Amino acid sequence: MSDAAFPSRRGLTGDALKLLAILAMTLDHIAWLLFPGYPAQAMPLTMHIIGRLTCPIMCYFIAEGYHYTRNFRRYALRLFLLAIVSHFAYIYASNAYQDWRSFIPFYSGSVLNQTGVVWSLLGGLLMLRVNDLDCAVWKKAALILLLCLLTFPADWSCIAALCILSIGSNRGNPKKQLLWCTFYVSLYGAVYYFSLDRLYGVLQLCVFLSVPLLRLYNGARSKNAALSRVMKPLFYLYYPLHLFAIGLIRTFFLS
């Protein structure tokens, strides 16, 4: 992960990393659209490997956003509203969508992948808040466990939330950040390996390809002021927008 202090402005700006995350996510979701299931083919595997760059970058910037925000409630509210909108976009874009009842959580009978990753990102933000509360450790642990249960049905389950907690609570200590994230992602990969698909379980470990990129983060925004203004909302709004687009393509062209 990245250091808290930035001795040099060389490297990648936050806007560059966010743009990279957007491109990787788009490629990943196009792969799910064109190659449903878990095909062991070079093209979809390559696209999914590149797509593993997205979640760690998102988690990192949620943790950074928590550190820098001047209004936590507004930040959390925006993320909550985005999670609600993204839920409908996520289900509409997924192979599980059939009709309006598909939008009802757990209607399919599964407890996994019932909503988008933004729900887990929100859970991670709330975990950081809980971690900073002035209360007994057992109360913090209980609240974090509750948030794990609430985010478990989301894409990336509670793992994304726990990674945000690890990154934010160990800010300035890249070794601890990486150690805890490695533990959580390995756990996720193991569950994926034994319950869904072995090859794609191993593929989840490709999230660590994002570590060298995050180490290059220089803590700065783009020198292009217009790009910087656009990237701030686009980084979040692009998620539901591109999923709605994928859903439309699936409905009208691939059904």
Predicted regions and their residues:
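Alpha-helical transmembrane segments and their immediate juxtamembrane cytosolic regions
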Residues: M1-S255
